Curated annotation (Swiss-Prot):
It comes from Cyanothece sp. (strain PCC 7425 / ATCC 29141). GO terms for biological process: photosynthetic electron transport chain. InterPro entries: PSII_cyt_b559_bsu, PSII_cyt_b559_CS, PSII_cyt_b559_N. The keyword Electron transport applies. This b-type cytochrome is tightly associated with the reaction center of photosystem II (PSII). PSII is a light-driven water:plastoquinone oxidoreductase that uses light energy to abstract electrons from H(2)O, generating O(2) and a proton gradient subsequently used for ATP formation. It consists of a core antenna complex that captures photons, and an electron transfer chain that converts photonic excitation into a charge separation. Signal peptide: none annotated. This is Cytochrome b559 subunit beta. Heterodimer of an alpha subunit and a beta subunit. PSII is composed of 1 copy each of membrane proteins PsbA, PsbB, PsbC, PsbD, PsbE, PsbF, PsbH, PsbI, PsbJ, PsbK, PsbL, PsbM, PsbT, PsbX, PsbY, PsbZ, Psb30/Ycf12, peripheral proteins PsbO, CyanoQ (PsbQ), PsbU, PsbV and a large number of cofactors. It forms dimeric complexes. SUPFAM superfamilies: Cytochrome b559 subunits. With its partner (PsbE) binds heme. PSII binds additional chlorophylls, carotenoids and specific lipids.
Length: 44
């Protein structure tokens, strides 16, 4: 049992760190893009 089975991620154990790094960049950028797109339609 020395082969890499898919139940044990040995190749990438820092998957959660990459997930946090992606979402700390993706969530604010999507929020600001939505806010800027919404501001295009607001004419006071």
């Amino acid at each position: 049992m020395t082969t890499r089975n898919p139940n044990q991620p040995v190749s990438y154990p820092i998957f959660t760190v990459r997930w946090i790094a992606v979402h700390t960049l993706a969530v604010p950028s999507v929020f600001f893009l939505g806010a800027i797109a919404a501001m295009q339609f607001i004419h006071r």
